[in-house]
Amino acid sequence: MKIALLQLEVLEKNKEANVAHGLQLAAEAAKKHDLLVLPEVWTTGYSLGHLEQDAETQASPVLAQLAEIARNEQCAILAGSVPMRHADGKIYNTSAAINKNGEIVNLYDKVHLFGLFHEEDFFAPGNNFQAFTLDGLCCGSTICYDLRFPELFRHLAL
């Protein structure tokens, strides 16, 4: 399995440029890899004061475009994380797992918000951690500060 970890310069307060650049890099990397992993909040960076207008939904064009890349290139994508507004109206720091057929097979909302960045002022904490299958592999998602809490990984392993 060939895995690409996408690293890009995220411009503060310039979602349009971030999305265009991220999708371009994703399309290029997906041609040569089996799995593509994007970074946390790659569409917005930590311009958290702009989340009300910058938050995605599950039906957003960004996820649809990543799904199209996955389907066209037969490359699974862990879509980093994006600020996502859910049906409850709250914004979560959400990671989508997209299989090589372009189907979203898991959405994970960051559970442990990082106090130093005051994430709790902008994001709601998730509680939906579960293992999932991505193109035949058993996987689990976590985001950044979640790594400080081993019980989350223990739960995913069981």
Put a short name on every predicted segment.
Residues 55, 68, 86-158:
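Active-site catalytic loop in hydrolytic enzyme cores
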Residues 9, 42, 82-83, 146-148:
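Catalytic metal-binding/acid-base residues of hydrolase active sites
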